[in-house]
A protein has these predicted regions:
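Conserved phosphate/pyrophosphate-binding and hydrolysis machinery centered on Walker-type P-loop NTPases
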Residues: 19, 38, 51, 63, ...
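Extended interfacial segments that mediate partner engagement and assembly in macromolecular machines
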Residues: 26, 75-143
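Solvent-exposed alpha-helical segments within well-ordered globular domains of core cellular machineries
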Residues: 9-13, 27-31, 42, 46, ...
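Residue-level signal for pocket-adjacent positions within structured domains
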Residues: 28, 43, 56, 68, ...
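Cys/His-rich Zn2+-binding cysteine-cluster or related metal-binding knuckle/ribbon modules and their
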Residues: 2-8, 17, 27-92
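Long C-terminal interaction/binding lobes of large macromolecular proteins
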Residues: 129-198
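Conserved, well-folded catalytic cores of nucleic-acid-processing
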Residues: 14, 18, 36, 51-54, ...
Length: 198
């Protein structure tokens, strides 16, 4: 027997399908939303729809933005000759929080994972190689220290090495299997400063 009505169960199921939201959190959110004033729920749903409609990939680095270029790629004070390669926009945000990295980024939107059927053509590698035709001096590979992240880093290193562009990998200090988005700013900064050439 279902404890809640069809509408409540459906809302809980939809919320529980979001990453990082378990069943208890989904229930808590569902009850909160149901008890919110209708105008606030309407505003929230409109904001979600607007974001879905207007947010897209930056045409340069592939982070999420609502303009053609993200604020980082538009910023002429950034060092456009240094590109940090990250797996996702959350990792980019983690490095930006350090306030120390002055280059630009390239977001892969994933990592190579043969076990999951994700190959090099399934992430934004072709776009990265295209960017290297510009005035790029260094590529910093800042993928996660998971098996997939390490595989991706090695693949990128082998791909770029023949171009003569300096390729570095962030230092460890980031625990093996750790996701960058959960690492504190000091550890990320030390990993960036201690990067090694591939």
């Amino acid at each position: 027997m279902d404890l809640y009505s069809g509408y409540i169960n459906k809302l809980i199921d939809e919320l529980a399908a979001l990453p990082g939201i378990g069943n208890k959190s989904a229930q808590r959110l569902a009850f909160h939303l149901i008890n919110m004033p209708k105008d606030k729920v309407t505003r929230l749903s409109k904001t979600i729809l607007d974001a879905k409609e207007h947010v897209r990939y930056c045409k340069e680095c592939y982070t999420l933005t609502d303009d053609e270029l993200c604020p980082i790629c538009r910023n002429e004070k950034r060092d456009h000759s240094t590109i940090m390669v990250v797996e996702n926009t959350r990792d980019l945000a983690a490095y930006e929080k350090t306030g120390k990295y002055e280059g630009v980024y390239h977001v892969l939107h994933g990592a190579i994972s043969p076990m999951l059927g994700i190959g090099p053509s399934d992430i934004k590698l072709k776009e990265l190689i295209e960017r290297l035709k510009g005035d790029v001096q260094e590529v910093i590979i800042a993928t996660n220290s998971s098996l997939e992240g390490e595989t991706t880093a090695m693949y990128i290193g082998k791909l770029i090495k023949p171009t003569g562009i300096k390729v570095t990998r962030i230092a460890s200090g980031v625990p093996v299997g750790g996701d960058l988005e959960y690492i504190d700013e000091v550890t990320l900064l030390r990993a960036l400063e201690g990067r090694t050439e591939l």
